[in-house]
Amino acid sequence: MAAAEPSPRRVGFVGAGRMAGAIAQGLIRAGKVEAQHILASAPTDRNLCHFQALGCRTTHSNQEVLQSCLLVIFATKPHVLPAVLAEVAPVVTTEHILVSVAAGVSLSTLEELLPPNTRVLRVLPNLPCVVQEGAIVMARGRHVGSSETKLLQHLLEACGRCEEVPEAYVDIHTGLSGSGVAFVCAFSEALAEGAVKMGMPSSLAHRIAAQTLLGTAKMLLHEGQHPAQLRSDVCTPGGTTIYGLHALEQGGLRAATMSAVEAATCRAKELSRK
């Protein structure tokens, strides 16, 4: 029998917003961590209510989270994070594994704000983590080994697909997948509205469009096909699909989509420099 995957006894969250709650919910649902072994902190009770409903422990003390948990996920707003790290730095030890989900805060900045040799990772999730179907990338700091990386990847797979990448890819992931959720929604909306134009009721059209995206994504992931191959499989000579694809090409779908990812990535890099 294969050895059980390692799992920390306690996981802490500093910041208790929607993404933190989604990650905690995924960990609990997947049985990776028991609810009573999760401790979350926030300045007020407003965001802590979700953690309390999950059966997690809560506090208003960020230092208490660090003193109780060796794996801590920082899910604060980026502009707040430096002050939070300064607050908890006195209780950080070399035993801690600290994870930041704050967009635009580099590993070098995190390491500068924390004691020497602190083990730090950056994680960038996207909104579908809320339904445990997220696309997540993580980048490790200078003092993080493969065992810590594998542990975090094992945990985050409770929230979707998790890939380790060089830090240089994190901003690209923002353009591709963070912002990509909105791009896909825009396409799904347009797909459904095309059906509405042709006479289908709106609610039905939107359900079918969303299911079409879901089914297509599963085929690409489960069968390992390149999108071009699946697209070719759907086309028949002189059939409906090739006529529709021609219309998309005339509308510049590919170029517009590539430009959208490029624009979002450039903006992410710009924000990272501020």
From Swiss-Prot:
It is found in: Cytoplasm. It is an enzyme of class 1 (oxidoreductase). Gene3D superfamilies: NAD(P)-binding Rossmann-like Domain, ProC C-terminal domain-like. GO terms for cellular component: cytosol; intercellular bridge; mitotic spindle. One of its GO terms (biological process) is L-proline biosynthetic process. Keywords: Acetylation, Amino-acid biosynthesis, Cytoplasm, NADP, Oxidoreductase, Proline biosynthesis. It catalyses: L-proline + NADP(+) = (S)-1-pyrroline-5-carboxylate + NADPH + 2 H(+); L-proline + NAD(+) = (S)-1-pyrroline-5-carboxylate + NADH + 2 H(+). The modification N-acetylalanine is found at A2. Its EC number is 1.5.1.2. One of its GO terms (molecular function) is pyrroline-5-carboxylate reductase activity. Pathway: Amino-acid biosynthesis; L-proline biosynthesis; L-proline from L-glutamate 5-semialdehyde: step 1/1. Coiled coil: none annotated. It holds the Pfam family F420_oxidored. Competitive inhibition by proline analog N-formyl-L-proline. Weakly inhibited by proline. Homodecamer; composed of 5 homodimers. NCBIfam families: proC. Oxidoreductase that catalyzes the last step in proline biosynthesis, which corresponds to the reduction of pyrroline-5-carboxylate (P5C) to L-proline using NAD(P)H. Proline is synthesized from either glutamate or ornithine; both are converted to P5C, and then to proline via pyrroline-5-carboxylate reductases (PYCRs). PYCR3 is exclusively linked to the biosynthesis of proline from ornithine. This is Pyrroline-5-carboxylate reductase 3.
